[in-house]
Amino acid sequence: MERVKQRIIETIIQINRTHTLPAYGLLLVGPAGTGKSQIAYAVARILKLPWTTLDMSSINDTEQLTGSSRIYANAKPGIIMEAFSVAGESSLVFIINELDKATNGKGNGNPADVLLTLLDNLGFTDNYMECMVPTVGVYPIATANDKAQISAPLMSRFAVIELPDYTAEEKKVIFSKFALPKVLKRMSLKEEECVV
């Protein structure tokens, strides 16, 4: 985990020194439960930028991302435009969870293609709004369980940081220091009333 921390610290230092975002985002790859999303949120807090989250495992159609044309009765802006709206500015950390699920579009088009336009820093156009949002201030941080499922063009937009799974001993420490106290408090139990 020290190597992971070092890579992230190097990126943050680079951003703070140059006052510009790198041309690539961060891709945190590792097994479920290794804290990838929490690390992404921590980086956003350290950079003092607003953040928004996009969960690719729930995206079935590109129109969910890009919005639908106003010619349709049920037309609406896409999730990406809504995220910019909620953030209130175009300089933000865009946290893309489950990036490895982006290529599994079951509907109209490939969601990964839409992400490429967002990650190119050339601007993003929503089909409903029909206007381009500048993306120069967008810093993407993505998470994935299996980088083999991510296309080469998408991978080229990220610096990859691999997070190893926790050892059995580390899992015991995490459980006893963090999870167990929360469970005991929720159940109004004392530690001596519980056998672990």
Language-model region placement:
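Walker A/P-loop
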Residues: 21-56, 85, 152
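Helical "lid/switch" subdomain of P-loop NTPase nucleotide-binding domains
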Residues: 76-77, 92, 98, 107, ...
